[in-house]
Design a protein with these regions (language model features):
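A short acidic, helix-capping loop that chelates divalent metal ions and anchors anionic groups
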Residues: 192-196
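Residue-level recognition of alpha-helix initiation/capping sites
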Residues: 5, 55, 101, 166-167
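A short, structured active-site edge motif that brings together acidic residues
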Residues: 75-79, 150, 189
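Short beta-strands and strand-loop turn motifs
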Residues: 43-44, 119, 153-157, 187-188
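N-terminal secretory signal peptides and thylakoid transit peptides that target proteins
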Residues: 2-21
């Protein structure tokens, strides 16, 4: 059970309810969030509109909007996104991708975003295939995306072992580092197998609080 905001902690410590509550309640809002009109782009990877990761996403967005953030949401599982074939026609952003699909709707919002939120169910210890399709297509706008901005990870998993989330978190953190972004929070929801199970955990509240905290206006 985890929220990781701005500070480094031991992963096992992060996977406890106490650490999650401590981080959510005691960390101050970051200074960069003081400006108004923060542009937030949320990309989800769940194929279940009423699933656990969607619940976390909804709560994060609710918190973000309450403090004035401008939120754009892209539900990848319900969009037409073709897998990157590595043809290199785009040349890392020098030309358009050969696939004319719904990524052309998403790309301007990714490029303009102050904060990018990735939301996923945990599928075999990684991103869902639907979200990974989108991430792979970052290649076509790599040069535009490779610039300072903020990032958040929201994830939900059925199981609650201490080794449940490290692989996903490492993948996300590596992506963020490569892109030159700053990780400002992770909600890693364990024991979130069904929506009703998730509703009985602290993770929806933590997602809401994180949305408010990282998107707060002065």
């Amino acid at each position: 059970m985890t929220v990781h905001t701005l500070h480094r902690f031991d992963r096992r410590t992060l996977l406890t309810a106490g650490a999650a509550s401590l981080l959510a309640s005691h960390l101050p809002a970051p200074a960069w969030a003081a400006s108004s009109g923060l542009k937030v782009t949320v990309v989800t990877g769940s194929p279940h509109r009423h699933g656990s990761s969607f619940l976390l996403t909804d709560e994060f967005i609710r918190g973000a909007k309450e403090v004035g953030a401008e939120v754009y949401r892209f539900d990848a599982a319900f969009k037409r996104v073709t897998a990157c074939s590595g043809c290199d026609h785009c040349g890392l952003g020098a030309a358009d991708c050969v696939y004319r699909d719904d990524m052309f709707e998403l790309n301007p919002h990714l490029i303009d975003a102050d904060l990018i939120v990735l939301s996923t169910p945990l599928y075999y210890f990684g991103f869902s295939a639907q979200l990974k399709l989108v991430i792979d297509r970052f290649y076509a706008i790599n040069s535009q995306l490779h610039s300072p901005r903020k990032a958040v990870l929201l994830a939900a998993a059925w199981n609650s072992n201490d080794w449940t989330f490290p692989a996903l978190a490492h993948h996300y953190e590596t992506l963020v580092r490569y892109m030159g972004w700053e990780d400002v929070g992770q909600i890693l929801g364990t024991s979130c197998g069904t929506r009703s199970q998730t509703e009985n955990t602290e993770f929806p509240r933590l997602a809401y609080e994180l949305g408010k905290k990282v998107c707060a206006r002065a």
